């Protein structure tokens, strides 16, 4: 610690920014030292300091009372009567705090009132969040029965206590303490999951076909729809109305959603082409993208299709080829390797 020694020797003549104290006490000889009075409460700490003997540790600096009335502000550790109360009478306010851990009586009263208020608030919160003690937990935590289940006794004890942690409020998810927010929230109250409507009775296949006023895209007695196996991949009504995946995607999505919502069919089943028909049509498309009427009639007779089916298949196949060419062009132009 030679820095402090150097500071003490040259502090009166020069300014040293690296020193803690560079003002000589001889410059202020007329002013009394503010640390002249003895320490009233010395704070000691269990750990030892490793500093030099002439350097005072920071944690052991005495806390002095500057301008405070000792009788008015008793210390916390001085619950021994007149020594902390101040004066020779020994009956100051500090002497009355000995029974309350060193606090004055008004401090003890305030602390007791605060503790009572906190205990009352905690008890109110527990009453609001916890279920009443008189109810059975199987009534509170009863699991919802499945929609299609037959009425009868519950299957096993799983429905008795499915959730043992908190009572479920009216919203079905959060505890009962959150019901106040749902009461103040705008909009209709939470109604819970609604059971799906019962499905309509399925109609027989023959009645659905006869009752449909429209004929399919492959209409005609000699259509191969009757020959197609049900396990074959459906590609659209003769791929003429839907094409080989060429119909607009919005229309296909609407058809899927309508078929999912309404259980009864409002149109005939979209029958796919057989592999033989697709192979012959693709072979003709490879040689002639646009087919003339004679070749179209010849194909329709050979494949047992209608003239309209062959015409619409070629239209959709041209649109598919156009899309494939566009995607191919984007791939090759966007790829820096080509």
Curated annotation (Swiss-Prot):
Listed PROSITE patterns: HOMEOBOX_1, HOMEOBOX_2
Region of interest (Disordered), ranges: 179-270
Function as written in the Swiss-Prot or TrEMBL entry: Sequence-specific transcription factor which is part of a developmental regulatory system that provides cells with specific positional identities on the anterior-posterior axis.
Main subcellular location of this protein, as a coarse class: nucleus
Protein name per its UniProtKB record: Homeobox protein Hox-D11
One Pfam family matching this protein: DUF3528
Protein family according to the UniProt entry: Belongs to the Abd-B homeobox family.
Protein's UniProt keywords contain Transport: no
Keyword hit for DNA-binding: yes
GO molecular function terms noted in the UniProt entry: DNA-binding transcription factor activity, RNA polymerase II-specific; RNA polymerase II cis-regulatory region sequence-specific DNA binding; sequence-specific double-stranded DNA binding
Gene3D superfamilies for the chain: Homeodomain-like (1.10.10.60)
Gly residues: compositionally biased ranges: 239-250
Species classification: Eukaryota, Metazoa, Chordata, Craniata, Vertebrata
Keywords: Developmental protein, DNA-binding, Homeobox, Nucleus, Transcription, Transcription regulation
Listed PANTHER family: HOMEOBOX PROTEIN HOX-A11-RELATED, HOMEOBOX PROTEIN HOX-D11
DNA-binding positions: 266-325
């Amino acid at each position: 610690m030679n820095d402090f020694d150097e500071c003490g020797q040259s502090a009166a003549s020069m300014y040293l920014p690296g020193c803690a104290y560079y003002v000589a006490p001889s410059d202020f000889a007329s002013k009394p030292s503010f640390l002249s009075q003895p320490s009233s409460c010395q704070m000691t700490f269990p750990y030892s300091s490793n500093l030099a003997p002439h350097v005072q540790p920071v944690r052991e600096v005495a806390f002095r009372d500057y301008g405070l009335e000792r009788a008015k502000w008793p210390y916390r550790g001085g619950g021994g009567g007149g020594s902390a109360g101040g004066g020779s009478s020994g009956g100051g306010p500090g002497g009355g705090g000995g029974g309350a851990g060193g606090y004055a009586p008004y401090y003890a009263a305030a602390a007791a009132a605060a503790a009572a208020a906190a205990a009352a608030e905690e008890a109110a919160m527990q009453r609001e969040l916890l279920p009443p003690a008189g109810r059975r937990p199987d009534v509170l935590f009863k699991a919802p029965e499945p929609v299609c289940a037959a009425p009868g006794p519950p299957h096993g004890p799983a429905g008795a206590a499915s959730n043992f942690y908190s009572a479920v409020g009216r919203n079905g998810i959060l505890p009962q303490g959150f019901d106040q927010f749902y009461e103040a929230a705008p909009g209709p109250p939470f109604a819970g999951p609604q059971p799906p409507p019962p499905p309509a009775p399925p109609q027989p296949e023959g009645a659905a076909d006869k009752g449909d006023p429209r004929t399919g895209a492959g209409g005609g007695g000699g259509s191969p729809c009757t020959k197609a196996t049900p396990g074959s991949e459906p590609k659209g009504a003769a791929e003429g109305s839907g094409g080989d995946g060429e119909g607009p995607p919005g229309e296909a999505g609407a058809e899927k959603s309508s078929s999912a919502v309404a259980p009864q069919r409002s149109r005939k089943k979209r029958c796919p082409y057989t592999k033989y028909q697709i192979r012959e049509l693709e072979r003709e498309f490879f040689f002639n993208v646009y087919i003339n009427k004679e070749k179209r009639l010849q194909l329709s007779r050979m494949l047992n299709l209608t003239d309209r089916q062959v015409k619409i298949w070629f239209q959709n196949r041209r649109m598919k080829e156009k899309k494939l060419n566009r995607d191919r062009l984007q791939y090759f132009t966007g790829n820096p390797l080509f």
